[in-house]
Amino acid sequence: MKFKQDYFDQLSGFYSQVTPQGLPRPQWLAWSEDAAALIGLKQPDDELLQGLAGNQAIPGASYYAQVYSGHQFGGYSPQLGDGRSIILGEAEGPQGYWDVALKGAGMTPYSRHGDGRAVMRSAVREFLVSEALHHLNIPTTRALAVIGSDLPVWRETQETAAITVRLAKSHIRFGHFEFFCHSEQGSKDKLKQLLDFTLSQHYPELSRDQAGYIAWFNRVVADTAKLIAHWQAVGFAHGVMNTDNMSILGDSFDFGPFAFLDTFEEDFICNHSDPNGRYAFGQQPGVGLWNLQRLAQALVPIIASDDLIAALNTYQHHLVQAYLVLMRDKLGIKLVEPAGSERDEADLQLIGGFTLLMEANRLDHTNTWRRFAQLDPNSQHSSLRDDFIDLAGFDTWYQAYQERLGQVSDVAGWQAVRAQVNPKYVLRNYLAQEAIIACEEGNTQPLAELHQLLTRPFDEQPEKEAYAKRPPEWGQGLIMSCSS
């Protein structure tokens, strides 16, 4: 790996330099060739294993933990920071630079009484979801590898330590700006320094003045809205949408007790530390705006309040428009003239009517949408109908749907497009859990097979049909722990 160190060199005081605590007897548990290509790596070898396990220095790496704060479940935590993640620097790849971070590489000044370790369970889940979201065409950080060991660590029970090697275009979070606004170490000059760095690295086309700052914040609002529209369309619940888990690039970031919906439930909670459902699936769009408002508050010293408010007021428009594009594609309906608020509202009612039916009839989210790839849209007798208990409700909806759809001239082509936007396979929690159990028993083959499956989520893969089934009784509606 060839590194540059722009964050380390240009933002002194925004991090602490640290030394990794290596993993004894490390072993490769998972490796993403896709992600490796981003930074010019090919096959994993023992030298790389020892380096990424924190056991020997990698030439050119700097090893630092970033400081930030954030709002967690609505309350402000004045200092958080990388408590177990160590960034090596920005690695050069064929099409740009990627931060390389070792998540679980030991204690830092920000560990807050933690041990700085990650357990194998959480490392495997982060690896799988990072790569799954990417192949679902959803903006996300990437995962290069999982490195396991036999080092015991204690959470609710004894587990083994592991490292996820994360790649990110940036690790700058909403919480970075909050820290340098609200903390004693912060100042207007440091906020401006951080924002100027962000623009120079990721938005070089924008000027480093008020006009550029406003344009940047508008971009962050739009990108965040579009990301959450993707989550809602595919049925992904992040689970811990704290502001320190929000990327300024609009990437999915910092995965814990996430879930893809099995049965469609608007109020589904995937995190057992969230009994009130602050981060329930259906709450995510509103939380996205709330988090942007917290970011805006932190930017008041350097961006005019009126401009921040004006940008925030565009969030709902960006969210709805992005959601409509995705859901029209899933349903196979075209945007017809006249476009505008009346047409959008009618389509939102059509989409909402279908999701309400799915919820009332306890249907599987992924499998139900996938059925549109086999649907004859011109037939009065929908193959979907048999899935519903409320036949009258479905018939009413389907009639409205066909009227909106119109006659389809190329049915096979229409179905093929639906198959490319309605995935057959998603990372169901029970599938991840089965792979984790196998890893605990020393068998990484199920993890490798699941990873490969998730790189082709839209393909039929008939030999993998079992992965598309609804979860067994033990795996239904799994609620995951924040402990990792």
Swiss-Prot record:
Record-listed E.C. numbers: 2.7.7.-, 2.7.7.108
Domain of life: Bacteria
Active site: D244 (proton acceptor)
Pfam family, one: SelO
Keywords linked to the UniProt accession: ATP-binding, Magnesium, Manganese, Metal-binding, Nucleotide-binding, Nucleotidyltransferase, Transferase
Cofactor dependence: Mg(2+); Mn(2+)
GO function terms (MF aspect): AMPylase activity; ATP binding; magnesium ion binding
Binding site for Mg(2+): N245, D254
Binding site for ATP: G81, G83, R84, K103, D115, G116, R166, R173, D254
Keyword field contains Transferase: yes
Reaction catalysed by this enzyme: L-seryl-[protein] + ATP = 3-O-(5'-adenylyl)-L-seryl-[protein] + diphosphate; L-threonyl-[protein] + ATP = 3-O-(5'-adenylyl)-L-threonyl-[protein] + diphosphate; L-tyrosyl-[protein] + ATP = O-(5'-adenylyl)-L-tyrosyl-[protein] + diphosphate; L-histidyl-[protein] + UTP = N(tele)-(5'-uridylyl)-L-histidyl-[protein] + diphosphate
The protein's role, per its UniProt record: Nucleotidyltransferase involved in the post-translational modification of proteins. It can catalyze the addition of adenosine monophosphate (AMP) or uridine monophosphate (UMP) to a protein, resulting in modifications known as AMPylation and UMPylation.
UniProt-listed PANTHER family: PROTEIN ADENYLYLTRANSFERASE SELO, MITOCHONDRIAL (PTHR32057:SF14)
Entries under NCBIfam families matching the protein: PRK00029.1 (NF000658)
Family to which the UniProt record says this protein belongs: Belongs to the SELO family.
Protein's UniProt name: Protein nucleotidyltransferase YdiU
Organism expressing this protein natively: Shewanella loihica (strain ATCC BAA-1088 / PV-4)
